[in-house]
Amino acid sequence: YLVNPAGYAALGAYMFLLILIGSPVNFLTLYVTLEHKKLRTPLNYILLNLAVADLFMVLGGFTTTMYTSMHGYSVLGRLGCILEGFFATLGGEIALWSLVVLAIERWIVVCKPISNFRFTEDHAIMGLAFSWVMALACAVPPLVGWSRYIPEGMQCSCGVDYYTRAEGFNNESFVIYMFIVHFLIPLSVIFFCYGRLLCAVKEAAAAQQESETTQRPEKEVTRMVVIMVIAFLVCCLPNASVAWWIFCNQGSDFGPIFMTLPSFFAKSAAIYNPMIYICMNKQFRHCMI
């Protein structure tokens, strides 16, 4: 054991809790939306995509991590490590790029940079395809030799190798690519869209261009999406910051707990999206009841 066995027991219990909550709430989101036709709107397609991404993380990654935490090391071997790292990365990236699509949708609908534009089912499907292509562009390269998935922290979960400069894997170039293309760029797009959105909402309120009844539904949807983005940042920024620090300070003395806690905290992302959606979407709650 790299740390006290009680630490592994705590991680195992934490992962069990995430599975216990994450599986039913995400399945509930999928079931209720697919069961009720009035919930099958273009915007909800993207929210369904978030639920699918969360299920990838819960079923493909968390179950493996819980099992290895109970044993105190990567007991499933190289293949198990690769699968866990792949599903965790894929699910996290689908969620991030889905938030990008949601941000762009909110910007176009509220700010109207393109006159007479309606976000239709075709646009939603294009957004879904885009989020999957970008997520696969991040999760697949370590499977084929550009970087690799290795045990990290307390050795009971796996992720991209930003710890070493192992020969033949080009870890440095992949980590830089991942941070720029799959972290900084999507965050920049999200911040741009919500920056413009905030300005537009203030201008509309000041000029009273629209009635309160017209503005209210858009405000509620926008508020829900903004809270999802904030929750994502709270969960994932610590993990990304620690990963970048380790990458830039390879060889420095840092313990397994320092590497593990932000990573496991980020995994809670799999339960907050559906809970925000359920709590803040009145129409969904009515259909659920």
From Swiss-Prot:
GO terms for molecular function: 11-cis retinal binding; G protein-coupled photoreceptor activity. The record marks E84 as: Plays an important role in the conformation switch to the active conformation. Glycans are attached at N171. Keywords: Cell projection, Chromophore, Disulfide bond, G-protein coupled receptor, Glycoprotein, Lipoprotein, Membrane, Palmitate, Phosphoprotein, Photoreceptor protein, Receptor, Retinal protein, Sensory transduction, Transducer, Transmembrane, Transmembrane helix, Vision. It is a multi-pass membrane protein. It holds the Pfam family 7tm_1. GO terms for biological process: absorption of visible light; G protein-coupled opsin signaling pathway; visual perception. The modification N6-(retinylidene)lysine is found at K267. Belongs to the G-protein coupled receptor 1 family. Opsin subfamily. This is Rhodopsin. It comes from Limnocottus bergianus. The lineage of its organism: Eukaryota, Metazoa, Chordata, Craniata, Vertebrata. The gene is rho.
